[in-house]
Amino acid sequence: MIRITSSKKSNSLLDEITALSKIRNALLNDKIAKKICKEKGIGEWFLAGVPIKFDKIKQSAKTVDSYIILNKSLLKKPFDIMMRYVIHELTHSIQHVQNFRKKDTKKENEEYLDKDTEVEAFKYQVEFDAENRGQGKAEKYVEDLLDYHKIKGKERADKRDELLDEPR
């Protein structure tokens, strides 16, 4: 007797394309993404063209020369978690475009959470998180971030207040 079976294999390329389509649609309609564009002085058209891809990287997401790169592991996370990283990296993407070819070596030596570019991106990310997942979860995320970077004492309280405040 011959038995024929099939297994449903995940089509990772199709999964990525589906997620990218959903991300693009969300960006075009998200009020935080639109706010970032407005406050950074760039048209909302940027949301339709910002390059985004999935790749195998160590961190959850990063931006290189304005290209947003998301860790493939985010495909397994809830969409609002994926989008909070997209919002953070969108800020960096615009920063890259606006500062094209400028390099500030002074800032390279700053602690990660002391860099103005990171503070700005995290503020938008936390605002997105608060609106989409609730203020409590946004605050927990900030606490976890401060734990991860081993920030303690008065510096921790100051950084927490800074990150939970609205972006300038």
Predicted regions and their residues:
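Short, conserved alpha-helix that lines the donor NDP-sugar binding/gating region
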Residues: 122
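Zn2+-dependent metallopeptidase catalytic core
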Residues: 16-44
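Post-HEXXH active-site segment of zinc metalloproteases
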Residues: 80-84, 96-119
